[in-house]
Amino acid sequence: ALRLAALGVGPGDRVLALVKNRVELLLTMFATFKLGAIYVPINTELKGAFLEHQLRNAEPKVVLVDTDLADAFHGVDAGDGDIVAVVFIAGGIPDQVPPVFSTARQLSYEDFSALAAADAGVLVTPKPEDIAFIMYTSGTTGPSKGVLMPHAHCYLFGLGTQRALELAEADRYYICMPLFHANGLLMQFLGSFIAGAWVYVVERFSPNRWLDDVRASQATVTNALGVMPEFIFRHPESPLDSDNNLRVVMAAPVADEWSTDFERRYDVSIRQGFGMTECNIPAYTGPDDPLEVGCAGQVLDEFFEV
């Protein structure tokens, strides 16, 4: 946090991250919060006009980018934004730095880590209503909208998951979804953080590698969104598929064609839920609820009115 402060980051400033599933993403996220600044994790597949829209909209003071993703910024304009520094992660400063960063201070992550720290007096404890993130929607009806997400809203993503899945210190959460998304970052990582559980994070989802990863990590919990659980189920079956430590898979939506057989095959309980970046996860199925297609569970009426 004090090294981000040395780059000029302070309350209300934005730190934009085009970063794969790496520990550096999580460390700089918490560092941003300790300065009262706002973290902006964006989709690592963005390029061209889609990337430019979010860069111009967020107006970050500092940009973090994986070195092998930096080419995505070629041809992109920051508009009225004033990027004072760019930090290249896992690979150092590229030979051809995109022109959008030409006036910014350019550092490798090692350079950044070696910066002289600012005075500790700049550290703050954010209030629940302070903005923690700008997370961008998928842009179904037009350009992606940046959702202003207060700390309390983000914490509730994790708390709801922790309670619904009964996460405890002994659990191990296998995270194969992107950490720029509320599901991977807030439901899975933050839910585990609240519970004091372990996390095992991989770069991306692979149905071919899924079960091997689950076994290697000794995972007890994981999430599978959209078509992911069906892709897993369509993988060739083996009599050893149930040889794993999973107890719960948070999956939505599910289908009659495979949901019950998925539970039997992998010896797990499927839980469902409903939510969006903007509104949190107001409903989950519980451990005693039947597995029903089209049912997102019961409303968390302690926190939501639906």
Residue ranges of model-derived segments:
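Conserved AMP-binding/adenylate-forming
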Residues: L2-A49
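ATP-dependent adenylate-forming carboxylate-activation enzymes
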Residues: V19-K20, A37-R56, T67-A72, A197-A216
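Conserved AMP-binding
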Residues: V19-R22, N43, L167, M177-H181
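Short hydrophobic alpha-helices that are characteristic scaffold elements of the AMP-binding
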Residues: F30-L35, N57, H181, L190-I194
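Conserved pre-ATP/AMP-binding loop-to-beta segment of ANL
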Residues: F101-E110, A114-Y136, P143, E166-R172
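Conserved AMP-binding A3 loop
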Residues: A132-L156
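Conserved AMP-binding/adenylation subdomain of ANL enzymes
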Residues: Y155-R172, F180-T220, P229-F231, H235
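Gly/Ser/Thr-rich phosphate-binding loop
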Residues: A216-A224, F233-V293, Q298-V306
